[in-house]
From Swiss-Prot:
GO terms for cellular component: bacterial nucleoid; cytosol. NCBIfam families: DNA_YbaB_EbfC (TIGR00103). It is found in: Cytoplasm, Nucleoid. The keyword DNA-binding applies. This is Nucleoid-associated protein PMT9312_0020. InterPro entries: YbaB-like_sf (IPR036894), YbaB/EbfC (IPR004401). It comes from the Bacteria. One of its GO terms (molecular function) is DNA binding.
């Protein structure tokens, strides 16, 4: 600490540099997630959905022969595909955020920032 209880100017400058780098990396990550397409598929592979890394629905693909199934079967397949895509998207987002914030111990809710 320098005089008057203020931090050393060099330390302050370094902290600002790190903050700016984190901000730039966070924007880059946001762009990557936005452009990412994550696929989820029903157990019987009759329905596929794609969502972005930000969990924005992008498209749905349904196999022709599922249209002969009953309403409940179609709904179940759609739900399975959405849930799988969402789970993969969430996992991907957490991993990328962890890579970005690793070692900073930011204690962000929902993100494990420890190396356990």
């Amino acid at each position: 600490m320098a005089g008057f209880g203020l931090p050393n100017f060099g330390q302050l400058t370094e902290a600002f540099k790190k903050a700016k780098q984190i901000q730039q990396d966070a924007q880059k990550l946001q762009d990557e997630l936005e452009n990412m397409e994550i696929e989820g598929e029903s157990d019987d592979e009759m329905v596929k959905v794609w969502i972005s890394g930000n969990q924005l629905p992008l498209r749905v693909e349904v196999q022709e022969n599922i249209l002969n199934s009953d309403k409940e079967k179609i709904e179940q397949n759609i739900l399975q595909a959405i849930q799988k895509a969402h789970e993969l998207s969430t996992t991907t987002m957490k991993e990328r955020m962890n890579d970005l914030t690793g070692g900073l111990n930011l204690n962000l809710p929902g993100f494990d920032n420890t190396d356990s």
